[in-house]
């Protein structure tokens, strides 16, 4: 009996270590979310697409889709109901979409706009040698303050050798605009470990939200993370988390990395592998953040299907296309392999 009690104590200590970088108030939030996850299990199935439902495996792919407007066409002067009708006509129907999973054409069950609120984590490299000052870093969460839509919430986390919560999930502009004093540049960056903590302890409990987003602010450098890059990327893809990056100049100048991609390549794979995009810190950050928020609210669709004729032990490339040339599509590049 004593030995069993000791093992339980050790497990509790392990859990404490995992969340040590997150303050008590967030631990409470995570615990409550985990309890609620039982009631949200059906939503979890749709988001992860990894559990059979009624004998079939429901899978969801997040897609950014929009029509390219002809610049030569006159601007619409409609208002009220007429404007609403015009907006409805711009919605892209599933009939003009084709979808291939691992080279096998799939029957699309639904392709519909996702106007639900977003949960966005701004993950900022707070390490000593990053080629950017804290004032510029603080400008990123501040840029979200006027741009997030109703229901959206943003969390700010800084990382060096460990992640630390700067601002918990909030839609309060004052909190998002006052992170400068909480930033400090120290130590070395463990980006992959920080992303893993965000995935496991922050976004996984938020599985009821279909829009779970990470905005990485940094150059993509990782030093000595415990989790391997491929394992991390597979987790993000399985959970349908979208990664954006606001890229800082590479402090390594493209130097080769042992057992990890180069910094710029890491950001490229993280964004392309999850359907996100890369922006440059040298560009107007306010414009970049506005584009992120606008496309999350206005251009995000969910494609739902039951995979047929696929092999889950293989990496499966995804191909989504449209019969209409004016429609642009962006989505994660592939489903990761899974052992049987």
PLM regions: where:
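Intrinsically disordered, low-complexity proline-rich regions
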Residues: 4-16, 22-42, 83-84
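Scaffold/interface architecture of coatomer-like assemblies
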Residues: 46-340
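N-terminal acidic, proline/glycine-rich, low-complexity intrinsically disordered segments
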Residues: 1-5, 47
């Amino acid at each position: 009996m004593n030995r069993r009690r000791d093992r339980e104590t050790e497990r509790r200590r392990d859990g404490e270590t995992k969340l040590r970088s997150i303050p008590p108030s967030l631990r409470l939030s995570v615990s409550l979310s985990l309890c609620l996850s039982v009631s949200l299990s059906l939503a979890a199935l749709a988001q992860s697409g990894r559990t059979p439902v009624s004998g079939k495996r429901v899978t969801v792919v997040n897609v950014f889709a929009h029509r390219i407007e002809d610049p030569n066409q006159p601007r619409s002067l409609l208002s009220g109901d007429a404007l609403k009708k015009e907006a409805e006509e711009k919605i892209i129907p599933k009939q003009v979409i084709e979808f291939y999973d691992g080279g096998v054409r799939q029957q699309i069950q639904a392709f519909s706009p996702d106007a639900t609120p977003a949960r966005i984590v701004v993950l900022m490299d707070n390490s000593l040698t990053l080629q950017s000052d804290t004032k510029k870093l603080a400008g990123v969460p501040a840029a979200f303050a006027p741009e997030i839509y109703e229901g959206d919430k943003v969390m700010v986390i800084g990382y060096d050798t460990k992640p630390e919560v700067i601002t918990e999930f909030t839609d309060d502009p004052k909190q998002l605009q006052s992170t400068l004093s909480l930033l400090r540049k120290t130590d070395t960056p463990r980006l992959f470990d920080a992303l893993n903590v965000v995935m496991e302890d922050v976004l996984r409990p938020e599985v009821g939200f279909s829009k779970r987003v990470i905005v990485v602010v940094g150059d993509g450098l990782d030093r000595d993370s415990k989790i391997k890059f491929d394992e991390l990327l597979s987790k993000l893809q399985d959970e349908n988390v979208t990664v954006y990056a606001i890229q800082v100049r590479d402090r390594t100048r493209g130097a080769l990395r042992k057992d990890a991609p180069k910094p710029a390549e890491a950001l490229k794979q993280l964004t392309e592998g999850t359907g996100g995009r890369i922006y440059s810190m040298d560009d107007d950050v306010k414009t970049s953040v506005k584009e992120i928020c606008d496309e999350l609210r206005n251009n995000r669709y969910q494609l739902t299907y039951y995979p047929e004729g696929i092999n889950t032990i293989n990496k499966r490339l995804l191909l989504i296309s449209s019969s209409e040339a004016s429609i642009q599509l962006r989505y994660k590049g592939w489903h990761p392999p899974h052992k049987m």
